[in-house]
């Protein structure tokens, strides 16, 4: 009996890459193998030399089609099997392997906004705004919550696919939600987040709504959408000195701007110093401070071990870039401090 393999890849659209996918029918017992596509239609090639390679890197059950069908996450390669310039996973893998002994873990909080056409769900039809922020975060009841059907269906799909999804919640703005992926390693966390994003788009299709990962989906006195990224190493999970070393390393000379440059498009619109953010061009860290660039949870200070939360990444970030940057910066500093 044949089965369907949905090949998923990240395209070359700038400033924010899009997800693409197509279906291949495979014979029973056959493993997903390399495939090709027209890179000139995905901003990854010119028309006169348009072939690009899909290299499978992770296969999971397909919760949309069910049965023996699968989702196949792929890296994009050139026809000589080198990493394509849009392939950010290859550099991520190199850093992950270099610091594997430190056992980096990530938990990524992916925020997003559901739209009906040009209107965020929960905003009045015909224009105008809902009541001010306050009752929507982790809210319940039809006056506060919209889109839960999509959110629950997506959660179930991620679980059925075997992804390391760890929770969901309604966010501060109407129509805005969050799901969390992790704990998982440097590359695994990003792999699982990209598949979870694809599933979210796919589930939303069936409900006739669209998903926005825009950093500031509604201008004005409304929260932006981020991808707060929690990080730890073995040393951080065992002692507080390593927590401080990691937090300090992210503010070292040149590091704040290097990181925000890789944290998604529209960073200046979201990181204003308002709405639970720190200014994009300043670095700070503090205990229980959601107005800092990096937050140390209060329980971490009490326990004298745990993790840090980088609050700067946008919802539209490339998680391969985010986990690579944090792993490289923090693990290098911890290695130099002999805190491994």
Residue ranges and their predicted role:
Residues 1-340:
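Glycine-rich, acidic/polar active-site loops that bind/position phosphate-bearing ligands
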